[in-house]
């Protein structure tokens, strides 16, 4: 019996087209929560830029958060798991981005900054994702504190180039223009394990929903993994079930299919 639902945000709960949560999704989550199921967020976003869930938060529908792809998990005000990237690999990524002349976002526990912001940062983070403008700092300043997640604006080819210099890091993508980098082992799969340990829920009682490359680990790990209909084929292949696209009531349809609501 399913007791815990894990949802990615962008492309799963929140439409890339409307930048809103479909009304059918809100109604489905309300119905599930009313039946006693726990609802958790599992996102690549840091806490500070989760700015699009007010329709769920205002209804008290969220029981906990997996953020930064599993590197920072919290329930209410209690941090139940956090993990920093080894400083040597932070320095390697900073040097790589500085040399390439590409932006990189560095995320600390309570602070986010960006180095070398360009039009792509503005287009994606500020205009498209509606993130507040981040402070611009030098690479030296950005890496002076403990870093939990790095988001370099690198291509998949550049990702292959830097990979040997960051051997103990995880690399995930939920948008083609950048990668999210965390410490080794910090994935949404890890986040699920930390959340269910805290709540005393069994893995066989979990269901996860996602659409991006950074969702693959949790779709495979949860008892039931549901891929959104607009997801790429490698994401769909990792899932147990493929539902309709987000803008065609995919969440609601999947939850009805499995008898959750």
Regions found by a protein language model. Name each.
Residues 3-18:
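Asp-based phosphoryl-transfer active-site loop
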Residues 36-40, 61-62, 146-150, 204-206, ...:
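Short active-site oxyanion
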Residues 2-4, 22, 181-261:
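Mg2+-dependent phosphoryl-transfer enzymes with acidic/Ser/Thr/Gly-rich catalytic loops
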Residues 60-61, 69, 165-168, 221-222, ...:
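Short, structured coil segments at secondary-structure junctions
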Residues 23-120:
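Active-site phosphate-binding/coordination module
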Residues 57-60, 81-84, 121-125, 190, ...:
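Short, hinge-like loop/turn segments at secondary-structure boundaries
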Residues 96, 100-209, 213-218, 230:
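Conserved acidic, metal-coordinating active-site core of Asp-based
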Residues 1-7, 30, 34, 201:
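Non-catalytic pre-domain segments flanking phosphatase-related domains
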